[in-house]
């Protein structure tokens, strides 16, 4: 039961993991891609991505990003990783690009070594593994901290046109009214092996999702409090915008403002997790604001 709970319900709830044993796999050929369109194509790109992505093979993972990055014009990108050759990847991407109907302003498809691909996906393009650390973690680390606030949700079906338009408008509003911060929506593809595992086989209950959505805002240390307040208000408004179309939340994107977080994170697995908590940590030693409780009583 403890092993079941730690696969999707861990996160400091039951104890401290002291070691891991990995079943390593051969490293496959890896191809990366980045597609970017002019912002006026954003609604078409997101709508088509939501329809195209579930048709792709397990070897392809992608995300769709609608982001404001401090300029008056937001960005719309689709990026991803493919376990296979660039020529095969290009063939998978071509129908999607054609259906969008607007020529991308960036269309990169290329092979990459696995380690470098993971550095790029981890936000460390151009850095070594050593440099991809905070200086407090490694003296040669070059990363710096930034402040952010984030929320998450899941969708189990493509958004209707009205929902797509609402999110595109929300990013435009962020760029117009709070241009000093970065932020927006990132859709991460699910499906494949994730969804073939039953919802109760592990503590991770989100097994029917089409995509996970992370929506966030970030700012620098010297950002005025009034700007930060505007950014967090935008985030709260984005949650309202998504509410008709999305449900749940990803427990690794812990959200201190999330209401009904127990159900959002754990769904139908919550009662079993509480039972495991009561058995392994009856005194609630591993306690934090959103830790699994020892009882479901109010």
Q: What function would you assign to each model-found segment?
A:
Residues 1-298:
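Soluble FAD-dependent oxygen oxidases
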């Amino acid at each position: 039961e403890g092993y079941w709970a730690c696969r999707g319900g861990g996160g400091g709830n039951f104890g401290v993991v002291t070691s891991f044993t990995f079943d390593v796999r051969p490293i496959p050929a890896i191809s990366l891609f980045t597609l970017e369109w002019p912002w006026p194509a954003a609604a078409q790109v997101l709508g088509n991505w939501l329809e195209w992505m579930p048709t792709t093979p397990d070897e392809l993972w992608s995300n769709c990003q609608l982001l404001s990055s401090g300029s008056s014009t937001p960005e719309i990108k689709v990026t991803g990783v493919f376990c296979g050759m660039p020529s095969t990847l290009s063939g998978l991407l071509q129908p999607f690009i054609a259906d969008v109907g607007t020529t991308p302003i960036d269309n990169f498809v290329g092979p990459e070594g696995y380690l470098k691909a993971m550095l790029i996906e981890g936000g460390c393009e151009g850095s070594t593994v050593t440099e991809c650390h905070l200086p407090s973690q490694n003296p040669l680390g070059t990363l710096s901290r930034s402040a952010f606030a984030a929320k998450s949700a899941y969708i189990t079906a493509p958004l209707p046109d009205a929902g797509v338009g609402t999110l595109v408008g929300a990013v435009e509003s962020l760029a117009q009214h709070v241009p000093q911060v970065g932020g927006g929506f990132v859709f991460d593809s699910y499906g494949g092996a994730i969804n073939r595992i039953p919802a109760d086989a592990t503590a991770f209950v989100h097994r029917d999702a089409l995509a996970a959505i992370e929506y966030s805002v970030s700012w620098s240390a010297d950002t005025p409090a009034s700007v930060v307040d505007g950014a967090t208000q935008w985030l709260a408004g984005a949650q309202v915008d998504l509410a008709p179309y999305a449900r749940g939340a990803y427990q690794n994107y812990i959200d201190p403002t999330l209401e009904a977080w127990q159900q959002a994170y754990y769904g139908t697995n919550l009662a079993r997790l509480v039972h495991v908590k009561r058995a392994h940590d009856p005194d609630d030693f591993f306690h934090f604001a959103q830790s699994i409780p020892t009882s479901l009583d109010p």
